[in-house]
Regions:
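Acidic, glycine-enriched active-site microenvironments
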Residues: 3-174
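A short, hydrophobic C-terminal helix/tail in secreted or cell-surface proteins
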Residues: 175-179
Length: 179
């Protein structure tokens, strides 16, 4: 029993250390305990959906995962779809009943995409009167996470092993359009 508790405490310590490293790397004011990640998916330009993945204290919070059917666009429009989804998500924040996971304001938003997605979503968040940091997750030619996109550049994360693993998990655990 003590061994199991020690293992759990060790894992929790690593998760907190990873979140602290992510905070420092991104220049955040506070540790991002509640992170939301968004990814747009489509099937040959149709059936557009967005997945929202939530990590709380460095662990997946599957009960808060959401899928959004994209209603405003036919065909592939990742930037417009991100704007739509974040608008709908934060409308839920303001309008849902207490107890909804939408009533929790994230400490950090990570988007699948680079600077175009970040630049498109920042005004949406600001227009809603919210102050939530937004960054993108940039992939390499092999579709692996390579960097985090900031407003006008990128932060390489390959040398930050634990942060790299966390960000990769956020990106690749997105709910599938067929879930």
């Amino acid at each position: 029993m003590y061994k199991r508790q020690a293992q759990q405490q060790g894992r929790l310590g690593r998760e907190i250390a990873t979140l602290e490293e992510l905070k420092n790397l991104l220049g955040l004011e506070k540790m991002p305990e509640y992170i939301e990640s968004y990814d747009i998916s489509h099937t040959f330009g149709a059936d557009n959906v967005a997945g929202m993945v939530v990590f709380h204290n460095g662990r997946p919070m599957k009960s808060a995962y959401k899928r959004f059917a994209i209603k405003g666009f036919d065909g592939q429009n990742d930037v417009g779809s991100m704007q739509e989804v974040l608008t709908r998500r934060f409308n839920h924040y303001y309008n849902d009943e207490d107890g909804s996971t939408f009533k929790i304001l994230p400490d950090l938003i990570l988007l699948d995409g680079g600077e175009p997605q970040v630049r498109a979503v920042l005004p949406v968040v600001a227009s809603m009167g919210l102050n939530v940091p937004v960054f993108g997750m940039v992939k390499d030619s092999k579709h692996r996470t390579r960097a985090i996109a900031v407003g006008n550049g990128e932060i390489e994360i390959n040398s930050h092993r634990q942060v790299f693993t966390l960000v990769s998990c956020l990106l690749y655990t997105s709910p599938s359009p067929r879930d």
